[in-house]
């Protein structure tokens, strides 16, 4: 008979294909699916595959004008989640042709743009993505990466030290610059604009940029070390963001900063390209990430946002502390830290890594540990994050009873002591408190910091368990 077979049919008839052999060029996704009661997992998984690729709720006439088998997403495997009766992991393969080259924005619009409001699902979380080599190669990635950054800064064999300037809102530009100078002079490598410092009435961006540049050049001259301040270029429009980045380059400073989730991937990728072309390092803050990644059964896991940032571009990204005031579990955190830094990462479910990822020499990103950490955490931080990281102590520097510069001295002495102890073969984690106590005997600044924050115990339940 003429015409086509109209009507609504089960997604699983077309989009659930357990025999499918995944291709090297497919983008693979692992979704944690919580179907509504009565919806079988195969149908729920197929619905996700359909709605995030070629499907719609009914058969349409124009399906006949395309090759569905070439373009459809496929749910190729479903597994139950241990200990969760209502949850499943659905694996979906997407043909590469569904995505625009070099666009993280398009990748997310396709994969997570529509399906999360789907009625057949009670909840949905994107746990991991496997980015195929063919797609990775369409991205510039980080402007410089870990090795180039070390070479630019001439700093090797240890983590880098930073500090967020507080109070985050309300300082004048000149006082802000003074705080920057004191921290850098004391021994930090970097200071940082807070993520919500953009250009407000009490401190316009241009004034801040000037005073911070003056501060870092003065500190550089006094210490003989290269210094940086993350100048936050985040703005209300891309044009304004670029104006700020260009001014930073004209000042000759080494690094700018961007809030990549609130600013958006399009703006971030634009800025990353500018930074590579103009020799600026790019520090990335993840403001708003917990809105997306904190729920265990719905949203997007941070490891996906981290992979997306490596593609879009950034040289540093905040990644939790494992020990401070913000949530984050050790194995999970180390999983996405490796995804940020390493070139090839094996599948390892115990660390939340669902797929083997090959970055084919895309530069790496330095993880930034920031939030509620102080000198007593230093041994654990050096042990957990290793050399290729940035450790940021905001309150842990500025809260020092003698002021910012002594606070910076305390952190630098603690770091150097931990690195030396490790290089001598001592177990920084086990002997941590002892290492810090020894160093504080010859550093009054460190002794004062130790007194304020006292020794710590690592005993609390993390929320993000597998």
From Swiss-Prot:
Its cofactor is Mg(2+). Substrate binds at residues 114, 164, 168, 286, 318, 370. Pfam families: RuBisCO_large, RuBisCO_large_N. Its EC number is 4.1.1.39. It is an enzyme of class 4 (lyase). Belongs to the RuBisCO large chain family. Type I subfamily. Mg(2+) binds at residues 192, 194-195. This is Ribulose bisphosphate carboxylase large chain. The modification N6,N6,N6-trimethyllysine is found at residue 5. The lineage of its organism: Eukaryota, Viridiplantae, Streptophyta, Embryophyta, Tracheophyta. One of its GO terms (biological process) is reductive pentose-phosphate cycle. NCBIfam families: PRK04208.1. Binds 1 Mg(2+) ion per subunit. It comes from Adoxa moschatellina. It comes from the Eukaryota. Heterohexadecamer of 8 large chains and 8 small chains; disulfide-linked. The disulfide link is formed within the large subunit homodimers. PANTHER family: RIBULOSE BISPHOSPHATE CARBOXYLASE (PTHR42704), RIBULOSE BISPHOSPHATE CARBOXYLASE LARGE CHAIN (PTHR42704:SF15).
